Amino acid sequence: IININSEELLKAAGCNLSESFETNPSIDVNFSDALTGTKQIQMLGLTSPYLLISEENIPIVRGASQAYGLTFTPGTWIESIQITKGTGSVINGFESIAGQINTEIKKPFSSDPLFFNLFSSNMGRREANFQGSLKLNNKWSTSLFIHGNLRNQEIDNNSDSFLDTPLGEQVNILNRWQYTDLKKGWVGFGSIRLMQDEKQVGELGFMPEIHRYENFFWGSQINTARIDTSLKIGYVFPELSYKSFGFQSAYSNHIQEAFYGFRNYDIDHQSFYSNILYNSIIGNTKNKFKLGFNFSYDRYLETVDLS
C-alpha cells in the first residue's frame, strides 16, 4: 500500500482529487475526452471502471459520477490518500480489479480550528476555501468545509475555435461530526455533503441560453446536483485491542442534466451502501481474520433524446 500524506500532497498541491497524483508514478490521470474535459485514472493499464475509488473506505466515484467524480473532492479537504495496486480485498467493495484509491478527509477532532484561502491563476481559475472545526467537549467535535471555484475565462491556445478547458463553477459544502470515547472504545463519524457543479464546453462564443437549438455554434452544458450522507460506527474492545467491529452506511443522490449539441442526456442515480465488519484473531495476533457483510443498491433513471 502506498500512502500519500499531507507532506507529499504539498509537493504538488492540486485543486481537487484528480490533480493529487502528480508525484505518484503508479497512477496516470489523462483526459479521456479533450472536448468535455473528462479525466480518467489509469492503473496497471486499466482505467477507472476497474478501480475502486473510495472516500474513507466507502465507494464514491462510481456510476453516474464516474466521468467527473474526481473533481468533486477539493484538494484542501484531503488528509491523505492510500493506493493499492492490483486486485484488492473485497472488504470495502468488489470493484478493485486493477487497484484501489482511498481518500481520507480531514477529521473534526484533529483539524485546524480555522482555515481560509483564496487562489487565482492566469488560466482563469478562481477558488475559495473555508474550513472550521469546533470541539464541543472531550467526546464530540464538528467541522464545516465550504469550497467554491469559478472558471469563466475562454482559453484557445491552439486556435481551433474550441475551448481548451471547460468553463464552469462549483459550490461544495460538507458538514462532519465525530464522536470519540477511547475509554469505552467507541468511535463514530457522520457527514452530509451538498454539491452543485456546472460545466460548459464547445466553441468560443457559445452561449447556452441563445445558441442551444441553433447551428451557429456547437456547445455542451453539464449541470450536476449531488447529495452524500454517511454514518460510520466502530467499537474496539477495551481489554482486547485486536477485537473490533465496525458499521458503515452511505447514501448518495446524483442528478445530472446535460446536452451535447442537439442531444440531451439526463441521469438520476441513487445509491445506498452498507458494510458490517468483525475483526479478531485465532490463537495469537499472527493469525487474524475478518468477517463481514456488504450490501449495495443502485437505481438509475436515464433519458437520452434528440431535440
Q: Which positions does each model-derived feature cover?
A:
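Transmembrane beta-barrel strands of outer-membrane/channel proteins
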Residues: 116-120, 144-150, 190-196, 247-253, ...
